[in-house]
Design a protein with these regions (language model features):
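Metallocofactor- and cofactor-centric catalytic cores in central/energy metabolism, strongly enriched
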Residues: 58-62, 122, 505-507
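Catalytic-core signal marking the mid-to-C-terminal active-site face
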Residues: 429-547
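Flexible hinge/switch segments at interdomain interfaces of large molecular machines
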Residues: 34-44, 189-193, 259-266, 512-513
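Ferredoxin-reductase
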Residues: 2-13, 76-164
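An N-terminal, well-structured beta->alpha segment
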Residues: 2-104, 199-232, 240
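Short beta-strand segments
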Residues: 84, 141-147, 303-305, 390, ...
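Phosphate-binding chemistry for phosphorylated carbohydrates and sugar-nucleotides
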Residues: 13-14, 21, 25-28, 109-125, ...
Length: 547
């Protein structure tokens, strides 16, 4: 992994995206459905692309929106459709395009009051609250966001009535219908003008912000945070939660400083990520240099990505806490401080999350539910309360309300951030200090994720790796105990491989949203062992994708 000379430094002018050119390309570019890279493709979190590459243009948005209307009709989903969008430059035009199709199809659309930017968790929360107690007329939702991806990116997610990311069978249906519409030059897409859509009887306004903020007391112990007057800092990274944080501070009377309230779709205020891209990733020490530099001003600080479904935790004692480490801390704390959760509520993790989570679950006597990458695999369990917590290595998590009922079934960056404040106030230690106590008791993991460029063809080869392609019986000096191509929790394909020994493991898989592949590795022995794990994994992956 080659680190850019710009990494961790303020974004220079030459890296800033030309917003007028980008938006012009959104409207003028016409994708060719015969070219695979220009088709609609739902990854682990929706369809993403860039107008410059003909992978996220108005045609894509029109086609996906019509496909969703047809899916709703086929499934008998006829309640309101909650719509949110983030602060990326392409999100507002895409939201306008989507509304023109949704209104033409007679869908009751719930737009944010005052055209407020809306975080992903606020949409999931709204769907769940609306559908509670209903068996018909169910709501669903759309979020226009490419998450933490660079400023030139656009994205489109669909959340069905369970409030979580759409399952694979849903996205495949929508994807196929959208590509059919693209191939037919949008014949079959219903559309009215934006002015007509805004005035339509089916277009409504919804107060996402205050509904979400007022309900937080039912998932986080706000009294505990306020009672010790913690000094809290938050950097929304120019994202959709910019005004949510000030509302939270005011509503709950918290000593919370929003260190950056700027919204700028070039994201010029960011420090550059590892590869020379501007990427609003709250789990990256390169992208988070701004808040890390302020760590000593606060008892605990946090950040979220543009749609606020990911979190980053910064402490004065440890700086930026690695996502896996904070997941383990959160699980250990929550299951011992939520007495009204079901006694059989399980711990949800993905195959690339830390083995420390397994050890924490064992210590607190909770069942582990291990699934492929993708938060959609946690949605049903969070919905029915059989999962107390679901978390991903990429810093996405959600958990139940204090009474054990569902809060959100999509990733929520705000509640893990506020949980860091809750645990600091109640335990008198920040999350980094709590983590060190965990590792003293259970062992310290050394982990790394290596990202490398890969073409779509190479990603396809990697995704088809099978256990019989691993002929070695040893990995980094230890006997191989297990080779997985399917997750043990739900027996779903992981889209790659996970190879495990007594004190280490690696997993290799292609990214579902970017042209990269990822190797995850972890050792409970030390850095040298970790390095050996990565080297041997790299040999296997390079051999697979060079075929």
């Amino acid at each position: 992994m080659t680190i850019s000379p710009f990494a961790g430094k303020p974004a220079p002018a030459q890296l800033l995206v030309d917003i007028p050119r980008l938006v012009t390309a959104y409207y003028t570019g016409q994708p060719d459905a015969a070219i695979s890279t220009q088709r609609v493709a739902f990854g682990t979190s929706g369809h993403r692309g860039s107008s410059f590459e003909l992978s996220f243009n108005e045609w894509h948005v029109l086609a996906i929106s019509q496909a969703i209307c047809l899916y709703r009709e086929a499934q008998g989903i006829n309640g309101p459709l909650f719509v949110g969008l983030d602060t990326h430059a392409l999100s507002t035009p895409a939201g306008a395009s989507a509304l023109e199709v949704l209104a033409a199809n007679g869908v009751h659309v719930m737009l944010a009051e005052g055209d407020e930017y809306t975080p992903t968790p606020a949409i999931s929360h709204a769907i769940i609250c609306y559908n509670r107690g209903r068996t018909s007329g169910l709501a669903d939702g759309i979020v226009i966001t490419p998450s933490h991806n660079p400023p030139q990116s656009g994205g489109y997610k669909y959340n069905p009535p369970n409030g979580g990311p759409a399952d694979t069978h849903v996205t495949k249906w929508i994807e196929a219908k959208a590509n059919e519409l693209l191939a037919n030059k949008l014949a079959g897409v219903k559309r009215i003008t934006h002015a007509q859509a805004l005035k339509a009887d089916t277009t409504h306004r919804h107060d996402y912000l205050n509904s979400y903020v007022a309900d937080l007391v039912n998932v986080i112990d706000m009294d505990a945070i306020r009672s010790v007057d913690l000094r809290l800092g938050v950097d929304p990274l120019g994202g959709a939660g910019v005004r949510y944080w000030s509302a939270i501070a005011e509503h709950y009377r918290l000593n919370l400083d929003v260190v950056n309230t700027e919204v700028d779709s070039t994201f010029r205020f960011m420090s550059v990520d590892w590869d020379g891209q501007i990427r609003m990733d709250p789990s990256s020490s390169y992208a988070m240099q701004g808040l890390i530099g302020l760590k000593d001003r606060f008892d605990v600080a946090f950040a979220c990505d543009p749609d606020h479904d990911r979190h980053g935790i910064v402490t004065p004692s440890g700086g930026l806490l690695a996502p896996n480490n904070y997941l383990a801390v959160s699980i250990d704390y929550l299951f011992q401080n939520r007495p009204d959760w079901r006694a059989d509520a399980a711990v949800g993790k993905t195959v690339v999350s830390s083995g420390l989570i397994d050890r924490v679950a064992g210590r607190i006597g909770r069942r582990l539910y291990e699934v492929p990458v993708g938060f959609k695999w946690f949605a049903d369990g969070l919905f029915d309360g059989s999962l107390g917590f679901g978390g991903e290595e990429s810093a996405g998590a959600s958990f139940l309300r204090k009474d054990g009922s569902v809060w959100s079934t999509d990733k929520d960056g705000l509640i893990p951030a506020l949980l860091a404040a809750e645990m600091t106030s109640r335990k008198g230690q920040d999350p980094s200090q709590i983590y060190r106590g965990l590792t003293d008791a259970l062992g310290e993991p050394f982990a790394i994720r290596v990202d490398a460029k890969a073409t779509p063809a190479q990603k396809a080869l990697l995704g088809k790796l099978s256990p019989d392609q691993v002929t070695s019986t040893e990995l980094a000096g230890e006997s191989i105990q297990q080779i997985l191509s399917h997750a043990p929790g739900n027996n779903q394909a992981i889209g790659g491989l996970k190879v495990m020994t007594e004190n280490g493991w690696f997993a290799a898989r292609p990214s579902g949203t970017e042209d990269i592949y990822k190797i995850y590795a972890e050792s409970f022995i030390g850095e040298d062992h970790l390095k050996q794990l990565v080297e041997e994994a790299q040999v296997l992956v390079d051999g697979a994708i060079s075929q």
